[in-house]
């Protein structure tokens, strides 16, 4: 348990270095999520200083069956979690398989109307998925294919966080 708490602390420290840079590159809100008690929890965020943005406060609990970060977290979660979420019917096995194959997931208006997002996994040194990092914002700015705009930048940010773990 102590080692897990240290890993979470290290991940947060790395995220606090990387998330603002990713926010500056994208001009959009950036979040880091993990699974906790069957939900996705925002554990770090960085928001643009002005303008319309998708605000998710640290500590917010969100459902695991909608949104890009949920797809990422569930795609690499334990089978019991995958089965539970698949039974809800919002996320499909095909979506999870596609997420694992591409290394990212996107959503358009799933969690909140008018908001789009793209997310990638954050792994530890052994390759275990610990979290999901996401860029989110208004569909009007991000467009209907946010992965085309930000998946590569997210993957780079994820790699940097992994190197800090």
List each model region and its residues.
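Short, solvent-exposed recognition segments
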Residues: 44-113
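Residues at secondary-structure transition points
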Residues: 10-13, 60, 64, 145, ...
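Signal-transmission/dimerization alpha-helices at domain junctions
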Residues: 75, 157-165
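Short, small-residue-biased leader/transition segments that mark boundaries at the very start
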Residues: 3-8
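Short, acidic, Ser/Thr-enriched surface-loop or helix-capping motifs
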Residues: 1, 35, 124-125
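Solvent-exposed, charged/polar functional surfaces in cytosolic regulatory/catalytic domains
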Residues: 21, 25, 98, 160
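All-alpha effector-binding/dimerization core of bacterial HTH-type transcriptional repressors
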Residues: 9-51, 79
């Amino acid at each position: 348990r102590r080692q897990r708490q240290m890993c979470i602390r290290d991940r947060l420290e790395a995220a606090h270095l990387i998330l603002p840079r990713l926010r500056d590159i994208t001009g959009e809100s950036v979040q880091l999520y993990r699974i906790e008690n069957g939900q996705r929890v925002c554990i770090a965020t960085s928001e643009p200083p002005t303008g319309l943005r998708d605000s998710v406060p640290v500590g917010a609990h969100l459902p695991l069956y909608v949104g890009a970060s949920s797809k990422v977290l569930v795609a690499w979660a334990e089978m019991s979690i995958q089965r539970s979420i698949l039974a809800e019917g919002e996320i499909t096995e095909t979506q999870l398989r596609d997420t694992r194959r591409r290394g990212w997931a996107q959503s358009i208006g799933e969690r909140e109307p008018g908001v789009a997002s793209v997310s990638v996994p954050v792994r530890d040194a052994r390759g275990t998925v610990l979290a999901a990092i996401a860029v989110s914002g208004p569909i009007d700015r991000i467009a209907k294919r946010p992965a085309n705009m930000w998946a590569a930048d997210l993957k780079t940010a994820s790699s940097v966080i992994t190197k800090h773990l």
